[in-house]
Amino acid sequence: MLFRSGRARVRAALHIVVLNLLGSAIFLIAVGAIYAATGTLNLADLAAKVATASAGQTGLLRAGGLLLLVVFALKAALVPLGFWLPPAYAAASAPAAALFAIMTKVGVYAILRVHGLVFGPDAGATASLLSPWLLPIGLLTVLVATLGVLASRDLRRLLAHLVVLSAGTLVLTLGLDSEAATSAALYYALNSTLVGGGLFLLADLIARERGAARTRLDCEQAVARPALLGTLFFLGAIGVAGLPPLAGFAAKLYILQSAYLHTAASWVFSAILLSGLLVIVALSRAGSALFWRTGDT
């Protein structure tokens, strides 16, 4: 994060350090509560011991599980704990931002492991402990991130909001609580992570071609190689928006199929389809500003 100088990068790095220290402290408290109740931290052992936990251990397990959700939600930048990600990723260098886009999904994967293995449907009194939280958190994250994408006036910040949007989509899908939804989430995670990281690297190439305008979505400076960079941007845009024929379309289709019979299907369909449409609008506007218009027109 601090590979290059700059006030924005120093501020973003400071935020990341403070939040990571806070998250680590909460994580230790959560782990301590779970260990006190079960005497183990091995996930396989936890799954067995949580299922047979006594009434006296249930309180510690619930507290530990919910604290873990808070920690992993902070790592994955979910609402209301995701305020730090857009400015941090927008200020980071391209390689760092691309790596961070991958690391953000680690928080979602941790939620998947804890939710599915430790507090799954066979976890006794703590069965499906995280289920009531995942779907609402995912929906709110998708909503806030979509608004952030639309409001962005810088390509890097727009891409940072897309990272948050993909994390929200994953958590929303995990909240459906089915094997089909989990499979769809894993497929979507692979696609969104690769495309998101690639777009951050592409943003750095665009910035070098635009001079002082960098990645601002204005018309001050045209891109020197619009054909090549424009084609790459178009491919990345349809990939992240979920349009055919790229894998993003299949990933979102699998998510919708897994939600078809769920009681919250209307909310999931609305969130996925509306966010996809608005992302297309935002990326079309960004592409127009970067490749088609200049300050002389």
Give residue spans per PLM region.
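Alpha-helical transmembrane segments of multi-pass membrane proteins predominantly involved
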Residues: 1-297
